A protein has these predicted regions:
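Extended, charged catalytic domains and RNA/DNA-binding interfaces, predominantly
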Residues: 1-128
Length: 128
């Protein structure tokens, strides 16, 4: 992937986007971190430290992105459906925790599969 982004596509950045950097397996996370650093060409190609955080309906998928190495994927909140997904009125505790984590580590995210129906008003899943 890195060689494609650097050579064939002539991109200036790319991110791995693996689901939780290999499902919280130590070697998978380390390998993504290491290869992201390895293929950096300052001023020409800046791979970003990214992963996809996939939570099923209604919370959806988000691609997390960080400018620096070493941020581990955020685990899901254990417990009931309500703890993970919340309610339409109160929002999702899991997503609120995720946005606090992004803020703490200076990260950003893109919601690419909201996991909600268009009429559900998933704007509530965004950072205010």
């Amino acid at each position: 992937m890195w060689r494609y982004g650097l050579d064939m596509a002539s991109l200036d950045w790319i991110g791995n986007g693996d689901h939780d950097n290999g499902g919280n397996r130590e070697f998978s996370w380390w390998l993504v971190q290491k290869t992201t650093s390895l293929f950096t060409v300052p001023g020409a190609f800046e791979p970003m430290f990214t992963y996809e955080r996939s939570v099923s309906y209604p919370s959806g998928h988000r691609n997390a992105m960080f400018a620096y190495r070493g941020v581990r994927p955020l685990p899901r909140i254990p417990g009931s459906q309500e703890k993970l997904f919340g309610t339409p009125e109160a929002g999702s505790p899991d997503i609120k925790t995720f946005y606090a984590y992004l803020k703490h580590f200076d990260g950003i995210c893109a919601s690419h599969t909201s996991g909600t129906l268009p009429a559900s008003g998933n704007v509530c899943h965004c950072v205010p």
